[in-house]
A protein has these predicted regions:
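Glycine-rich phosphate-binding loops of nucleotide-dependent enzymes
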Residues: 2-261
């Protein structure tokens, strides 16, 4: 874990007793955990454990049925994704939310488009595409994300390249917390290694904070500082990397080991 986290005693994120019901279905049952600045937290659990629901609550897609979320010690009530984005929480979902007909730069700037200067540019809303493409190329290069060109349409790229662009967009704009839902699911071995290294480097050199959802326990154990395990909507364990192993994590996921709470 980055040493930066140890100097700030207020957790970046505190989730307290979050519940969520959909009709008669109780998707989350009193989930609580903290995330320090500069940490990578892996959120793991079997299908239907509540991982995606919890992430959607943190990112403002769903309101919790009950419970509180604190960001930098401040109570937050995100009633829409835009509110979470404004607070600095960026999320990359499995569907990536890329527009295939747009080029790389337009996707990176989606919803944050830059217009040309001057009265005409501002009045007519003319996009400053040269500036957007230049900034996109610089930003992705700094993140060591390799793409053919920022002018290339996303539909012409591989699944791995699309995933890298979606992650790059989140990293470009995220200021507080980056949530990655299965970030390596569509990637080959080399691209997976590239993404894992990028996440580690951004934590270690920039003090960025991540929540990563993944079913790949080897990847989880490699990059995570802390692992939060959900089972059937309940928080059953929080495990520090240096105090656990892959076998123990899997045991909590499957129920072979009882809840630690």
């Amino acid at each position: 874990m980055s040493s930066q986290a140890s100097f700030d005693h207020t957790p970046l994120l505190r989730v307290e007793n979050i519940t969520k019901t959909f009709g008669a279905v109780q998707a989350l049952r009193g989930v609580s955990f903290t995330l320090e600045r500069g940490e990578i937290l892996a959120l793991v659990g079997d299908n239907g454990a509540g991982k995606s629901t919890l992430v959607k609550i943190i990112s403002g897609v769903y309101p919790p049925t009950s419970g509180q979320i604190y960001l930098n010690g401040q109570l937050c009530a995100f009633d829409r994704p835009a509110a979470a984005l404004a607070a600095g929480i960026e999320t990359v979902y499995q569907n990536l939310a890329l527009i295939e007909e747009l080029d790389v730069a337009d996707n990176v700037y989606l919803g944050r488009e830059t217009t040309r200067g001057g009265l005409v540019g501002r009045f007519l809303g003319i996009l400053d595409r040269p500036a957007m493409r230049q900034h996109t190329a610089q930003a992705l290069n700094q993140l060591h994300i390799k793409i053919p060109a920022p002018t290339l349409a996303v539909r012409r790229m591989s699944g791995g390249q699309r995933q890298a662009i979606a992650i790059g967009r989140a990293l470009t704009w995220g200021r507080e917390l980056l949530i990655l839902d299965e970030p390596t699911a569509a990637l080959g071995v080399d691209e997976t290694e590239q993404v894992l290294r990028m996440i580690e480097e951004l934590r270690d050199t920039r003090g960025l904070t991540f929540i990563v959802i993944s079913h790949n326990m080897q990847n989880v154990y490699r990059i995570a500082d802390k692992v939060v395990v959900l089972r059937q909507g309940r928080h059953v364990a929080t495990l520090r990397k240096e105090e656990t192993n892959v076998e123990e994590i899997v045991a909590y996921i499957t129920g072979a080991r009882e809840s630690a709470f």
